[in-house]
């Protein structure tokens, strides 16, 4: 699957990456190769293979919640493109009723 430079620029923008023109070309080739491999995998007939969610029989080992120091507020917001009242500001994705 051949990606365009615009596709790669879009993905880079979503990931907040600044790529040079040479890096965009390199990423386009690499991402196109990855998508080609996925297309090959999609052609494999797995209808006779039973669905499997987990193969090791491991179970979750949970611990009690405990309050511990976390990332400082300023550091957590350092790379946020928009902030408001000390919180991340993001576009609304739900319609108000």
Curated annotation (Swiss-Prot):
Any one GO MF term held by the record is:
ATP binding
Supply the enzyme class, top level.
Answer: ligase
Q: Which InterPro entries match?
A: Asp/Glu-ADT_sf_sub_c (IPR036113), GatC (IPR003837)
Gene Ontology BP term (one): glutaminyl-tRNAGln biosynthesis via transamidation
Which Pfam families does the record cross-reference, listed alphabetically? Answer: GatC (PF02686)
Record carries keyword Repeat: no
Entries under NCBIfam families matching the protein: gatC (TIGR00135)
Q: Which HAMAP family match?
A: GatC (MF_00122)
Q: Describe the task this protein carries out.
A: Allows the formation of correctly charged Asn-tRNA(Asn) or Gln-tRNA(Gln) through the transamidation of misacylated Asp-tRNA(Asn) or Glu-tRNA(Gln) in organisms which lack either or both of asparaginyl-tRNA or glutaminyl-tRNA synthetases. The reaction takes place in the presence of glutamine and ATP through an activated phospho-Asp-tRNA(Asn) or phospho-Glu-tRNA(Gln).
Question: What is this protein's name?
Answer: Aspartyl/glutamyl-tRNA(Asn/Gln) amidotransferase subunit C
């Amino acid at each position: 699957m051949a990606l365009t430079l615009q596709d790669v620029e879009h993905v880079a923008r979503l990931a907040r990456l600044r790529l040079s023109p040479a890096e965009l070309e390199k990423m386009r080739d690499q991402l196109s190769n990855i998508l080609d491999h996925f297309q090959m995998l999609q052609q494999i007939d797995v209808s006779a293979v039973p669905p499997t969610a987990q193969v090791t029989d491991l179970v979750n080992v949970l611990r009690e919640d405990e309050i511990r120091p976390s990332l400082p507020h300023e550091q957590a917001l350092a790379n946020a493109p928009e902030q408001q009242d000390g919180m991340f500001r993001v576009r609304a994705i739900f319609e108000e009723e």
